[in-house]
């Protein structure tokens, strides 16, 4: 059973039966653990030993953060502290041996066992990912059929934070030597500055991202709510994990979900 076949089988079980029967599946123990406990693994998963010649490890060469190390036996190790979730290694891999973490199974489990309301925080990118037939209303209805209480569009908080950054820019920039690195929306941008150009961090506004702001707002209105972020960006998972590890008290575990 390939990894994709395993993933689809487990997803079907979770939807139809309400749980995954892992003991009935003949698959790699490593693959099973990644799908059942993605939070315990890096954002990028090597599925098998790398088939490329050692001097042509394209994924490692594409990583700006030196997060990928190739062992002598050909297996790859991804450093979760260095990986920012940019996805460059996945695009560079010519054998299709790398995949982004899949978090749908834990998301469905969180919806099923939630003791309070469950809200989907939807990234603005959904407007360009589906056909024009998929309206916000239809998407909200689909989430409700899956067990969600409702849907919140994160675009609203992006607008609010853009205004906040504009006000900060107006307050902080007075001379030709003053500058501010904007865009709190992008965790990849912030991660790059923090890890490669850390001396510039004082020039980054202190605003949280729209995803975090949306989660905080929902938790303010419904303290017992579960919030699940839905979007196409792998780096949002790194951001969510950072907030969780920092004991983020403004909201529940916010995970990025990819179809």
Question: Where are the predicted features?
Answer:
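Iron-sulfur-associated redox domains of electron-transfer enzymes in respiratory
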Residues: 2-14, 28, 101-259
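Immediate flanking context of iron-sulfur cluster ligation sites
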Residues: 42-46, 76-83, 221-230
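Residue-level detector of short coil/turn "hinge" positions at structural boundaries
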Residues: 21, 32, 37, 41, ...
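Ferredoxin-type iron-sulfur electron-transfer modules and their immediate structural context
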Residues: 1-62, 66
